[in-house]
Curated annotation (Swiss-Prot):
Gene3D superfamilies: Protein tyrosine phosphatase superfamily, Rhodanese-like domain. Keywords: Cytoplasm, Hydrolase, Nucleus, Protein phosphatase. This is Dual specificity protein phosphatase 8. It holds the Pfam family DSPc. Its main location: cytoplasm. Expressed predominantly in brain and lung. Its EC number is 3.1.3.16, 3.1.3.48. SUPFAM superfamilies: (Phosphotyrosine protein) phosphatases II, Rhodanese/Cell cycle control phosphatase. The lineage of its organism: Eukaryota, Metazoa, Chordata, Craniata, Vertebrata. It catalyses: O-phospho-L-tyrosyl-[protein] + H2O = L-tyrosyl-[protein] + phosphate; O-phospho-L-seryl-[protein] + H2O = L-seryl-[protein] + phosphate; O-phospho-L-threonyl-[protein] + H2O = L-threonyl-[protein] + phosphate.
Length: 663
C-alpha cells in the first residue's frame, strides 16, 4: 500500500495559514469532502474533489485523472512545469496512518503521489483549521443550474415576504399571521393554499380564499388555478394587494404564482418559473405541480389558438334567409322524417281550414331545417366534399309540404348547382277532372281558370350518371280518380278507380292496389325511349311503355296506364288492378284504353312532354311523402337498356313505391 510504503507528509493549520497569507504561488489546497460540506464553508482558494462512490470507483479503475477532477480554474496550476505543493484535507482526520486502505482519502492520496512531488495532509482537517483561522475560510453559493430540486415544503421559511408583482406577494404562514407586516405592505386579500394553515383574524371572509390541497404527489392543483387567478384579479381591480401563501411559501403557493404569471403575462412555464425564482429563490414546486403547470401551459396555448382562429373558423358565416330575399337551400330529411313529415302534412291539410286568399301555412320543419343549415354552414364544407358525399348515397325525399310552400317556391327553377346539397324531389299528384292539370281551389290565392305550363328541366348528358339533386316524380290517374288522404307508405286502395272489366263509376269497388314487385328478368323495369327526348326517363313497374302511342300499358290509357317522370330519374306507374305480373297489367290496360277519348289522349301527351302547372296550395299538402334511396355508380358505361336491367337487379329500395289514390 502507498500508506505502508512511504510515510505521509503532514501539515498543521498554522503552517497552512502562513502559506495562504503569503499571496500567489501558494500550495494547491484540495478539499476531499462532499460537495454540500464544501459549499457551506471551505478553506480559502481550495478545490473540491467530491468524495462519492462513483468518483472513488473511477479513480480505482483509472478511468479518470486528477487533472479532470480539479476544476478548470486551477487546472493551469496542475499543468505547470515547476514543482507544486499540494495540501489535502477532509473534515477531521488527524493521523493519516490510521486511514483504511480502501477509503476515499487513501485512494486520492495515492493518485496525487503519482502527479505531484510534495503531497501533505492537513492535521485535524477542516474542523481544526476553521476554528483557528475562520478568516481564511469562505463559503460560496452552489453552482447548480437554475432548476428545481423538488422537495416537500419546509416547516420553517428561509426568507420573509416576497413581492412578485406590484399587487401580488408570496409568503408563508408566519408572514400572514404577522398583522404588522401585512399592514405595512398594504395586504388585505389572502389566498391560502393549504388545509392546515389558519385564517388570519384581521382578514374578512370576503377577502379570504382557501384552496384545500396538501403538498404531495397526488393532489390536483390544476382545477383550482383559474379560480385562484380570478381571486387575484379581483384584488387587483380593487386596487389592493394580495398574498398567496402555504406553510412555507415554497411549493403550493409558488405554483399558483407561476400560473398567474403565465396567464397574465403570456409567459411559458419555464419563463414564469424563472420570473418567480429570481424574486424568491427558495421556491421549489414538487414534480407533481410542475407537471400540472405544463398541462396548464398547453391549455393556454390551445385557448390562444382558438381565439386567434375564432373569427375565421369558430363563428359561422351570416346566413342568407328570406329577409335577404334569397331562399335557403333545403336538405333531404331522413327516411323516418320524410314519412312522418308527409303524414303530418296530409293531416294538417285535411283538418286545417286556411282562409281564402291567405298564404299557405308555414312548414313545420322550417326551424329544424334552418338550424341544420346553420350547423352545416359553420362546417365550411367545400363543393368537392359535398360531391364526394353525394356520390356515396343519394337520397330523394318527396316532401311536398316542406319543399314547395308558396313563400319559398321558385317560379323558374334553373339547372342544379353541383355544389349544392341534394334537393327535394317533386311528386305531382294532380287532382280534378283532367290528368296533370290541377283544379282551382277556392282557398288558394293562385286559383285561376287557365293553366300555365311549367318550364321543363334540362336533361343531363347521357355520358354522365344520374346525379342531379332534383328530380320530379309524377303519379297520373284517370278522370274519375279520387285522392283520399292516407298516412305513411302502407298499401293503398282506390275505390274510385275502375278495375278490369268493371265500368268506371263513383260507386264501383276495386280490389286494393299492391306495390310493384321487385324487378326481375321476367318482369323488369321498362325504360321508354321517349325519355331521351322528353324531360326525363319514364319507368313502368307493370309493363312496357311504348314511345308515346296509346296502347296497353301506355301512360296515355284512361285507367290502366302509368307514367310520368322528369329530371332524369323519376317515374311512377299505376294500374286498375295492380300486380307484379306484366301480363295481367297489360290486359287491364287494354280494357281501360277502349273507353278513353282522343281528347284525353292529346291532353295526356301534352302532360308527358311538358311540366304541369304548380298545383294549388291545398292539393300540395294532400300529397304523399315517398322516399327512395339508391346507390349510384352501377349504370356508368352501359347502354341505356342495360342500365335499367342492371338497376332492377342491383338497386335496393328502403321503402316501397305505392300507387297513391287521388281525389
Amino acid at each position: 500500500m502507498a500508506g505502508d510504503r512511504l510515510p505521509r507528509k503532514v501539515m498543521d493549520a498554522k503552517k497552512l495559514a502562513s502559506l495562504l497569507r503569503g499571496g500567489p504561488g501558494g500550495p494547491l489546497v484540495i478539499d476531499s469532502r462532499s460537495f454540500v460540506e464544501y459549499n457551506s464553508c471551505h478553506v480559502l482558494s481550495s478545490v473540491n474533489i467530491c468524495c462519492s462512490k462513483l468518483v472513488k470507483r473511477r479513480l480505482q479503475q483509472g478511468k479518470v485523472t486528477i487533472a479532470e477532477l480539479i476544476q478548470p480554474a486551477t487546472r493551469s496550476q496542475v499543468d505547470a512545469t515547476e514543482p507544486q505543493d499540494v495540501v489535502v484535507y477532509d473534515q477531521s482526520t488527524r493521523d493519516a496512518s490510521v486511514l483504511a486502505a480502501d477509503s476515499f482519502l487513501s485512494i486520492l492520496l495515492s493518485k496525487l503521489d503519482g502527479c505531484f512531488d510534495s503531497v501533505a495532509i492537513l492535521t485535524g482537517g477542516f474542523a481544526t483549521f476553521s476554528s483557528c483561522f475562520p478568516g481564511l475560510c469562505e463559503g460560496k453559493p452552489a453552482t447548480l443550474p437554475s432548476m428545481s430540486l423538488s422537495q416537500p415544503c419546509l416547516p420553517v421559511p428561509s426568507v420573509g415576504l416576497t413581492r412578485i408583482l406590484p399587487h401580488l406577494y408570496l409568503g408563508s404562514q408566519k408572514d400572514v399571521l404577522n398583522k404588522d407586516l401585512m399592514t405595512q405592505n398594504g395586504i388585505s386579500y389572502v389566498l391560502n393554499a393549504s388545509n392546515s394553515c389558519p385564517k388570519p383574524d384581521f382578514i374578512c371572509e370576503s377577502r379570504f380564499m382557501r384552496i384545500p390541497i396538501n403538498d404531495n404527489y397526488c393532489e390536483k392543483l390544476l382545477p383550482w388555478l383559474d379560480k385562484s387567478i380570478e381571486f387575484i384579479d379581483k384584488a387587483k381591480l380593487s386596487s389592493c394587494q394580495v398574498i398567496v401563501h402555504c406553510l412555507a411559501g415554497i411549493s403550493r403557493s409558488a405554483t399558483i404564482a407561476i400560473a398567474y404569471i403565465m396567464k397574465t403575462m403570456g409567459m411559458s412555464s419555464d419563463d414564469a418559473y424563472r420570473f418567480v425564482k429570481d424574486r424568491r429563490p427558495s421556491i421549489s414546486p414538487n414534480f407533481n405541480f410542475l407537471g400540472q403547470l405544463l398541462e396548464y401551459e398547453r391549455s393556454l396555448k390551445l385557448l390562444a389558438a382558438l381565439q386567434t382562429d375564432g373569427p375565421h373558423l369558430g363563428t359561422p358565416e351570416p346566413l342568407m334567409g328570406p329577409a335577404a330575399g334569397i331562399p335557403l337551400p333545403r336538405l333531404p330529411p331522413s327516411t323516418s322524417e320524410s314519412a312522418a313529415t308527409g303524414s303530418e302534412a296530409a293531416t294538417a291539410a285535411r283538418e286545417g281550414s286556411p282562409s281564402a286568399g291567405g298564404d299557405a301555412p308555414i312548414p313545420s320543419t322550417a326551424p329544424a331545417t334552418s338550424a341544420l343549415q346553420q350547423g352545416l354552414r359553420g362546417l365550411h364544407l367545400s363543393s368537392d366534399r359535398l360531391q364526394d358525399t353525394n356520390r356515396l348515397k343519394r337520397s330523394f325525399s318527396l316532401d311536398i309540404k316542406s319543399a314547395y310552400a308558396p313563400s319559398r317556391r321558385p317560379d323558374f327553377p334553373g339547372p342544379p348547382d353541383p355544389g349544392e346539397a341534394p334537393k327535394l324531389c317533386k311528386l305531382d299528384s294532380p287532382s280534378g277532372g283532367t290528368l296533370g292539370l290541377p283544379s282551382p281551389s277556392p282557398d288558394s290565392p293562385d286559383s285561376v281558370p287557365e293553366c300555365r305550363p311549367r318550364p321543363r328541366r334540362r336533361r343531363p348528358p347521357a355520358s354522365s350518371p344520374a346525379r342531379s339533386p332534383a328530380h320530379g316524380l309524377g303519379l297520373n290517374f284517370g278522370d274519375t280518380a279520387r285522392q283520399t288522404p292516407r298516412h305513411g307508405l302502407s298499401a293503398l286502395s282506390a275505390p274510385g278507380l275502375p278495375g278490369p272489366g268493371q265500368p268506371a263509376g263513383p260507386g264501383g269497388w276495386v280490389p286494393p292496389l299492391d306495390s310493384p314487385g321487385t324487378p326481375s328478368p321476367d318482369g323488369p323495369w321498362c325504360f321508354s325511349p321517349e325519355g331521351a327526348q322528353g324531360p326525363g326517363a319514364v319507368f313502368s313497374a307493370f309493363g312496357r311503355v311504348s314511345a308515346g302511342a296509346p296502347g296497353p300499358g301506355n301512360s296515355s290509357s284512361s285507367g290502366g296506364g302509368g307514367g310520368g317522370g322528369g329530371g332524369g330519374g323519376g317515374g311512377g306507374g299505376g294500374g286498375g288492378s295492380s300486380s307484379s305480373n306484366s301480363s295481367s297489367s297489360s290486359s287491364s290496360s287494354s280494357s281501360s284504353s277502349s273507353s278513353s277519348s282522343s281528347s284525353s289522349d292529346l291532353r295526356r301527351r301534352d302532360v308527358r312532354t311538358g311540366w304541369p302547372e304548380e298545383p294549388a296550395a291545398d292539393a300540395q299538402f294532400k300529397r304523399r311523402s315517398c322516399q327512395m334511396e339508391f346507390e349510384e355508380g352501377m349504370v356508368e358505361g352501359r347502354a341505356r337498356g342495360e342500365e335499367l336491367a342492371a338497376l332492377g337487379k342491383q338497386t335496393s329500395f328502403s321503402g316501397s313505391v305505392e300507387v297513391i289514390e287521388v281525389s
